[in-house]
């Protein structure tokens, strides 16, 4: 824990509409509930952002000395699961188990912590039934033909999270959605659904059925965190109706002063100007992207902007002839307007680039390269007898980083703090001119030590630099279709030329490698290569 950990954490609360100091219900402890996946398919990058954001919050609050209980649910009962199970020819339970495992695999590749509790809807049926019964007993829900609906007009605070008026919603409801005449108002939503043939069902006082979507989170959060807890998180798309309905259910059952104190919502990932989502079909799965880039690169990319901001995911298709970026029309026709080359769809599939992911990959490689050199320096350099304080900006790096994190978990601002220290350390690694040996050593040592704390908070920069850089290099080579066996062969030829003191041949081979986009690093144990 940092020595500055006693300063307050300020966070934006969707419920209040402004930033507030985090004051937990129980001093020193924090309960966090986040809506997890509906497990009917592989996760896309937007789903992964909704997991990485609370993961960083949990890491940071623990770093600041709080004892955090983190609960993230799995929705394993849902209309989408039932539909997909029929398409894949398996039971809903089998499909949910399959994609829960795949979800865990994807999050492991992004270095997310496991939640302290991961409840499933199917394991929470008794608690859900009890909550539905409480709502019925209080006149907040009513049964119709085996369905049970929440009576929205009976809850006076409805709309306070999403800042919507019940009367205005009712005025336009009939035009937006098909009206179910069995419901008292179009806004009433199901907390229990009557069984349909071939679907999962449980016995209830209202007949066989299954839970509605919103009641599930109300029941699971109360079961594991109590009627009141500190932070509720999720994607911005869940504010209405899901989180609004959670509040209505939970406060309706337990009282107006209960449920989550702070509501946090992450922004969308935007692809081609639209929110990335399964419903729109404009998404890349996390699995597809981590086949091209290290998982840590993806995680780093997700942290480069403030969690409430939108994050643009860019894709470019290049002409295989002249490397010009093709617009949508050129991609569809296959004709490059710059050089006139005609390419098939199959050829263009191999010309896809992800510029902002590549930028994140390059930046992460720069940080790991700096860490590798800094650690090597500390291993080989003789430690001075007299310690001297680190130079600015390394001296205050961690404190400045933490200040940004205290201000609504601002990872984008926190990452910006690292730029000057990285430049300073690289300069010191290259040359120690102008500073004492003790100050040079102390600055590099302080950088490595502070980066270890940064790594604990962000979940980035904590891997062994050498193996990570090799992994990154090999994955980039595959993306660029670079023949690494050819590179290795040229390195061996160059090594032979150097041993034979044929400097002209060694330089010629180096130039050939440069033309391939490869830089050579000569060391006492031989030569290695990296991308320029």
Residue ranges and their predicted role:
Residues 2-40, 55, 105, 126-375:
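Alpha-helical recognition segments enriched in aromatics with Gly/Pro capping
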Residues 66, 140, 518:
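Short phosphate-binding/catalytic loops that engage adenosine nucleotides
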